[in-house]
Amino acid sequence: MNINDYLTYSATVTKENNFYIIKINSLEQETCTEDKDKIEYFAKSLILDYAESMIFLKRPIKPNKIKSQDNLLINMEYDFALKCMIRNIMYETTTRPSELASLLNISKQSVNNILNLKKKTNLDTLALCFNVLKRPLTIEA
């Protein structure tokens, strides 16, 4: 699992009538806006909504596998990417949030706050999640 797969998503933007259609290629999701200046904002919102819906449905969050310089590249936060990776590890290992809470010796509500995609979380806390899931976080240059 590579953080870069969750950091940058490729989007295609087409103009139809007065709307800009934004498609996140690897996720097969799309949205639209009338405001050209809000394209990146709507693209990020679409990626975030997609990830949250996958968490709700208890499915893995797809990484970006389509990398093309011809398309608009949407840069997500490192916090978002790490949380997607943790959620996917939990999915692979069938680890429930309550089990992660037990491993971390904290409440389930605290785990939900840590893994909330809309809240920022300290890198040390996220690294601890990787450790207790037996997939230590490694950073290479």
Describe the role of every protein-language-model region.
Residues M1-L7, S45-Q109, N113, K119, ...:
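Short, charged, surface-exposed hinge/linker loops at domain edges
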Residues E34-D35, F42-A43, N75-M76, R135, ...:
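Alpha-helix boundary/interfacial micro-motifs
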Residues T8-S10, F19, Q69, L73, ...:
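Broad gene-expression machinery/nucleic-acid interaction feature
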Residues M1-K58:
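DNA-contacting interfaces and partner/effector-binding or oligomerization modules
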Residues D124-E140:
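DNA major-groove recognition helix of helix-turn-helix/homeodomain DNA-binding modules
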